[in-house]
């Protein structure tokens, strides 16, 4: 679990850089802020493509080899991004980094889901808390290094990814095709399609909510009058809330059901995003949005596996499709900002959170007893 957490810390650092650096990217490449926001979508297009790569390799290669391949892919993209002299080369390198992220994210989640049921929620939550911790560190490093020196930061992250490959030798995970056959899926085919389709839609909206929030906090606050450094620090606060919330997943699950944790978190997130329309309140509310969203990702996966046990392929498809949210969410936000101005940001975020709440709530019609 330590290796998985370390990998996700680095990817959290990387993913959290884009939002605070959007203004810098716009100035560096002489483009508009909404055009710079395309970075977020390109990154997740790459992640979407990286999941099938992870899916194929984890079935045919050992877990440590898969993680090494995907980490080196990310390092290649980070190096290219640091050295790119023009916008299109920069976007191509962002895409390659996204491929690495998608592969690592899918591989790690698949490996953790394959572990024994006892303590699985804690392992998922703590490992994903590493992503949140890294995402706290990223904006802080931007403040320390200065946004205009982002290329050095990206180069250092690429080097960190290479060094992390040295710790993969301790991961013992045979190819999935060689793993012992697990119990068969006991849910009927039609019911499985309904449940899987519901959770795919819910997770697309969740990823849209999380990535768009993280990506547009800094531009909104910077245009609202805050310094770039303070806006980056508040983005770090969002990720800190996410990390703290995920660390608390174990105790929370002992007292509340996964569905209650998911729906309560989304409800609070929607209300807080609506409140962030008030410019003075936004800096204080966004860290609370992160805390509210913290348990949705891990608890939603546990909820799904409770409804359809032993469905490794379903989880793989879920992770693949959810990456679309990272493309759709920022793209919609960019269009809305172009049309209505920067103040529309929190309203779009609220809409995503409410839609996600509605789809997850519709999953209440399914129970673990739904068998066919």
What do the predicted segments below correspond to?
Residues 30, 62, 83-88, 117, ...:
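Helix-breaking motifs and short loop linkers at transmembrane-helix boundaries and internal kinks
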Residues 93-130:
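Cytoplasmic helix-loop-helix junction between adjacent transmembrane helices
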Residues 50-62, 146, 245-257, 337:
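Helix-to-loop junctions at the C-terminal end of transmembrane segments
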Residues 256-300:
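C-terminal transmembrane helical hairpin of 12-TM major facilitator-type secondary transporters
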């Amino acid at each position: 679990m330590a290796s998985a957490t370390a990998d996700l810390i680095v990817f959290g650092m990387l993913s959290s850089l884009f939002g605070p650096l959007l203004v810098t990217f716009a100035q560096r490449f002489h483009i508009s802020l909404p055009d710079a926001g395309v970075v977020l979508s390109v990154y997740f297009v790459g992640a979407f493509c990286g999941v099938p790569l992870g899916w194929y390799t984890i079935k045919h290669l050992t877990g440590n080899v898969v993680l090494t391949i995907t980490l080196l892919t990310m390092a290649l993209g980070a190096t290219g991004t640091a050295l790119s002299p023009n916008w299109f080369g920069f976007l191509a390198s962002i895409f390659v980094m996204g491929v690495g992220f998608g592969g690592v994210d899918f591989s790690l989640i698949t490996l953790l889901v394959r572990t024994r049921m006892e303590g699985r929620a804690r392992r998922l939550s703590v490992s994903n808390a590493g992503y949140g911790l890294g995402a706290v560190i990223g904006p802080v490093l931007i403040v320390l290094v200065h946004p205009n020196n982002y290329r050095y930061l990206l180069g250092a992250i690429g080097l960190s990814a290479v060094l992390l490959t040295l710790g993969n030798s301790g991961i013992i995970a045979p190819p999935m095709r060689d793993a012992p056959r697990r119990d068969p899926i006991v849910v009927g085919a039609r019911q499985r399609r309904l449940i899987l389709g519901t959770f795919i839609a819910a997770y697309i909206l969740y990823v849209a909510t999380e990535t768009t929030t993280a990506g547009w906090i800094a531009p909104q606050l910077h245009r609202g009058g805050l310094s770039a450094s303070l806006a980056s620090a508040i983005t770090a606060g969002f990720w800190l809330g996410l990390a703290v919330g995920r660390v608390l997943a174990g105790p929370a699950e002992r007292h509340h059901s996964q569905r209650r944790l998911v729906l309560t978190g989304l409800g609070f997130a929607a209300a807080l995003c609506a409140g962030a329309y008030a410019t003075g309140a936004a800096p204080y509310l966004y860290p609370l949005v992160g805390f509210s969203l913290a348990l949705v990702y891990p608890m939603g996966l546990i909820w799904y596996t409770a409804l359809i046990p032993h469905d490794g392929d379903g989880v793989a498809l879920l992770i693949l499709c959810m990456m679309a949210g990272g493309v759709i969410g920022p793209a919609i936000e960019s269009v809305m900002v172009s049309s209505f101005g920067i103040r529309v940001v929190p309203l779009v975020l609220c809409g995503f959170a409410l839609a996600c709440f509605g789809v997850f709530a519709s999953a209440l019609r399914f129970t673990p007893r739904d068998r066919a």
